[in-house]
Amino acid sequence: MSNLASFCARYSQQTMQLPGGAEFSYRYYRNPVARATVVLLPGGIGLPDLFYLHFERFAEHYSVITFDYQEQFTTNAELARAVASLLDGLDKHVWLVGQSLGGVIAQIVAKFHPERIEGLVLSNTCSLARDMGQEARDELMSMVENQRTWKRRLQLIPMPVFRRLMAWAVMRKTR
């Protein structure tokens, strides 16, 4: 098992230019004997390197892709389109593994780009199903409103500072 620094050295960031000119940065390990590719989608802070232990474990058997939620994609729909473009560029059909907000992104990508998706693994997220009951819908809307409140508060902290603080706090717990 490695630490984050050796992980980052082993699996360096790559960049792809998407149609329309946006650049998309990601980490990708192509396992030559893999039968499937896994895309790891982190939660709301969008720090994929927090999944580095998962990435390494999956890389033993699968090809693995992960990326942060880059600021040029301002809505979940834009990010989902960018993910689909990335997968088109890599010519990959994938399993999406989404945690929290990553689960929402996974569902959006799967809904609008099913031709690229082999399956979903969702954790600690909500359902985007149409047949959701009123109680579940009310709870989801309450969570969204709570996130909006936190987002307004967090906008006072510059995103690079916030991300470093979150990474530091999480990595402290994994030592």
Model region roles, listed by residue range:
Residues 2-23:
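N-terminal cap/lid segment of alpha/beta-hydrolase-fold proteins
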Residues 18-73:
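Conserved HGGG/HGGXW glycine-rich cap/lid loop of the alpha/beta-hydrolase fold
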Residues 53, 108-112:
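Active-site signature of alpha/beta-hydrolase-fold catalytic machinery across serine-
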Residues 77-94:
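Conserved acidic catalytic loop of the alpha/beta-hydrolase fold
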Residues 96-98, 123:
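Short beta-strand immediately N-terminal to the catalytic nucleophile in serine-hydrolase-like folds
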Residues 98-102, 106:
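Gly/Ala-rich beta-loop-alpha elbow adjacent to hydrolase catalytic centers
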Residues 111, 119-150:
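Flexible "cap/lid" loop of the alpha/beta hydrolase fold
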Residues 131-133, 149-175:
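Conserved alpha/beta-hydrolase catalytic His-Asp/Glu region
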